[in-house]
Structures are given as structure tokens and as C-alpha cells.
């Protein structure tokens, strides 16, 4: 999948039976195209984050009102595995996705869930190559545990505030990448 993406960008060329070679784009156009692509990617991520912040503010309130104790326990199990991986530096992408997916489900609103899933799929595409950030969005990971605790306490304002901090960390990574 990664090679296909690089091939589509003209960065590599795949020759059947011969291997993978550096693409044929000229240096000048490559630099300009990279700069334009970087700017568009950054702007798209910022816009997606703005939409996510607005939607998740209400999502948090719905989760606090609608989630069952069983769902909270399941989110707790996901959070525990996620945080263990974060603490030892293991890859945590799958657990991070499970965490957010579970929260989306816990709102018990199928339309809201569907809209959030579309936004989630869009940001996943953008984050395939996240602005050349090494270890992107790691600063946001500790907030997952405190967000879970606030949700479990059913404290809407506290959970919303923590979720905003989580998204602020992601935004900061994107802003730093642009400097």
C-alpha cells in the first residue's frame, strides 16, 4: 500500500520484474509540489481538527448521558491496554483507534456516529504521511487515560476540557511541523 502511494506521487516507479526505482520527477517541480502538498495537507488536518473539536464537544455530553456502565467498563479495558503500550513505547495505533471508536459508539446516536466515522476515515487518510512528523501526536496519548476517567465520573465539563487538551496536542504537532 505504501509503495502504491509513493508510486502515485511519482516518488518511486515500479517496473515489473525489475524492481522499484526512484521516480522521474524533476528536482524543481518535486520541491514545489512537495511544498504545495505539505501546505494543503496541513490546512486539511487543521480543518479536520476544527470539525472534530466541535463534534466531539457534543459527543462527550452524549456519551456521559447515554453510555451504559458496561460500555464504560469496556472503554476502561481498552484504555488500560492503550496506556500500557504508551508507557513501554510499543505501537499503539490500533488501541488508539479502538478507544475513539468505542467512544463514538457510546453516544448511541447512529447519525452522529456515521458523521464521526466519515471524519475519522478522512483524517486517517491525511495521517498516512503526517507532515514528516517523527512519532506524531504522542503528546496527546496521556490525555486518553484522564479522558476515560472523566467520562467514567460522568463529568461532562471535565471530559470536554480534557478532550480539548488532547486535540490541542495534535494541533501543536501540526503547527510545529509547519515551522
Where are the regions a protein language model picked out?
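Short linear motifs at protein or domain termini
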Residues: 1-54, 61, 65
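Structural signature of alpha-solenoid helical repeat scaffolds
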Residues: 132-135
